[in-house]
Amino acid sequence: MNAELKIARPLRGEVRPRSAVSGGVGLVGIVGLLAWVVVARIYGFSGPRASLCAVAACAAPMLVWSVLVDKVHLSPSNGIDWHSAPRPLPQSADTSFVKLAGLWATWAAIAFLYCMGRWYWQEPYLFSMRMFALAAVPLVVASIPYLLWMDRRLKEPRDGAWHLGCLLLGRPFQREMVYEHLRCWTIKGFFLAFMLAIVPGNWFGVVAPTTAEISTNIVRLTQWLIVAMFMFDTTFATVGYVFTMKPLDAHIRSANPYAAGWMAALICYPPFVMMGGNGPLNYRYATLGEDGWGHWFGGHPALLVAWGAVLVALTAIYAWATVAFGPRFSNLTHRGILTHGPYSWTKHPAYLSKNVFWWLSTLPFFVTTGNINDSIRNTFVLCVVNGVYYWRARTEERHLMADPAYRDYAAWAAEHAPITRLLTRLGRMVPRRSAQIAIAAE
């Protein structure tokens, strides 16, 4: 009997760990966004304001689903005590006002850095700056009742903002809590400005083209579908950066504390990006960019269809990796461990699909100069770019490994996620093969 029970009980690592986000929340976000895309294409709503409505159309159903279906506000991980009587307001008010001092100082510092960064006053960032300016006063006003209400319910209201407020007011504080607070808000301030800036462009690329323009040929259709996938990606990502809130259990648990992780991430985004223009990692020199495949395979219709389908599939996986987060997407942070969707295939679906997409779309070895040196150089540089994303993945894992939930997921993925399992086995074979060669050489 005992033996039968042991056989029936799943071994540790055989069952996929539970995902911190449900599959349903991303699906309802897709439905809301798709509905607005249909309306916008009918009425020609292709401008920046319509793109903001797209963010709202994506966010609203996800927030409703999160609260009414997933009941994330009741999750123990958000630190809110709904069962006990709230603290008396006079008892929690001092904590709230100290926290407000820290929070407002943080926002003021971010605004100052926006003013100092010249690139923020050029396109496409001007849209973000205008939106932040419009939101500033309402946000400051709304933060007062929000914190007064939240601090009466939080099990531990003295977070990083409170410790920063104590620092500013000359009270005792914990230095590491201040550092963690500043890391979280640096990430949010940097990436929200970028994501919001590129939302209108992707939105225009999806809504503005007519059906006749889209259906001109397979290359044009593929290009439109790829832009649509990126529109989904940036819209969901923007929602994620906006709604870092504890009542939604979408707060930041921790920000990556490693300098290597920040360096690997920041060189992939402006103004630090090294892959574009005259950057040292520009692998597109003398190519036709990400539309190169359409040129080089132009005389082969069947190949164009097959190649375009693969490119759309890769971009869809990339977008899916963001959609799976629901309202929690964020770079360089831990906001809950995902194990469903494309994360059941590999630990890094976005990086993998993106890098394969660059190879297949750009074809860096095909150059217009006819110079073999340019082909070799582009190929080598794209390999280096792949290495940068491998570096990003490893630094992210180093950060997330502090959470037992991620360690369980990583152990499961190594044996059961198809792509991760394959790569893990290949990795195990390399040193073994090297050892065999060394023994043979002896």
Regions found by a protein language model. Name each.
Residues N2-L332, G336, L360-E442:
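Membrane-anchoring alpha-helices and their flanking helix-loop junctions
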Residues K354-V356:
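Transmembrane-embedded, aromatic-rich helix segments that form part
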Residues H348:
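Short, conserved phosphate/pyrophosphate- and ester-handling motifs at nucleotide-, phospho-/glycolipid
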Residues R335-Y343, L352:
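Alpha-helical membrane-protein architecture signal
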